Amino acid sequence: MKSVKLKVALIANLIAVVCLVILGVITFMFVKQAIFHEVVKAETNYVKTAKNSMESFKARNSLALESLAKSILKHPVEQLDSQDALMRYVGKDLKNFRDAGRFLAVYIAQPNGELVVSDPDSDAKKVDFGTYGKADNYDARTREYYIEAVKTNKLYVTPSYIDATTNLPCFTYSTPLYKDGKFIGVLAVDVLVTDLQAEFENLPGRTFVFDEENKVFASTDKTLLQQGYDISAIANLAKIKENFEPFEYTRPKDGSERFAVCTKVSGVYTACVGEPIEQIEAPVYKIAFIQTAIVIFTSIISVILLYFIVSKYLSPLAAIQTGLTSFFDFINHK
């Protein structure tokens, strides 16, 4: 009788386990899609946050430069058309503007290539501003910020570069100055990405921003800021993908499979988030593990419960069997 009880319990439990496994597989497939969708949504939001930070950074600096240009151009042309005039009427403004905006340097590149500048060198000399040019083997007319500002006749932002003094990523924002139709020069500010990097350090995810030359200048992961760090794998794919279109790539550094979402920023920069595939899939497999544990636990409990339930309901059969055996023994039909 015990054998019958056990067999009934095992058969019933086997049916229950098969049903649970089928249900678990179907549930896992739907849960996997739902969780992956939520993870992609979260990663996309990280990129959007990084994009907003970069756009705000650029907008602040552009607006500041344009405001200074308007202020300078309020002077009559005779107060702007020579180096002496610029030093006398504008030099102090460059220093005040630099201090207020915490810029690395603020300067006017004149048509002859000479600078009137407020920068760390003038600070070291304990003066508000100074000049820089031919005597220092420097000609502003050969520099990208000057050439592009004059050529486009509008505000120009250089690709990021490493500042020699601070060894930090830096941008130059420049705009041409014209007064009464006369070219005065190019107004420019050097901007460290210190404030932008501080913002990124508080952002979620492994987000970063790079320029057209694939140089990362702000990132939640500081290892990406190292000179020569190769992001070509993700950068090349980002160029052919739509904004916020998820994709996978292989990182050359270690051959690991990774997941990414990228978007263009201001038409010049690219913001991305890049995570290992394992990290993206981890929540999915965690759910699968929990489901497997539940099936195993439920199966064990089912065997025990079914055994006792079957035992209870098969007990009368044992009594009947005993009675019949005694009856046939009595009439000698054993």
Place the predicted regions along the sequence by residue.
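Juxtamembrane interface helices immediately C-terminal to a transmembrane segment
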Residues: A9, T27-F57, N61, E78-L86, ...
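Extreme N-terminal signal-anchor transmembrane helix of membrane signaling/transducer proteins, especially
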Residues: K2-H37, K41, T292-F297
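Extracytoplasmic/periplasmic ligand-binding sensor regions of membrane-associated signaling proteins
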Residues: D99, S118-V191, L196-E199, T250-R251
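Cytoplasm-proximal transmembrane signaling helix
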Residues: N13, V17, V209, T270-C272, ...
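Membrane-proximal, non-catalytic sensory/regulatory domains of signal-transducing membrane proteins
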Residues: T142-Y178, P204-F208, E212-E213, I231-G267
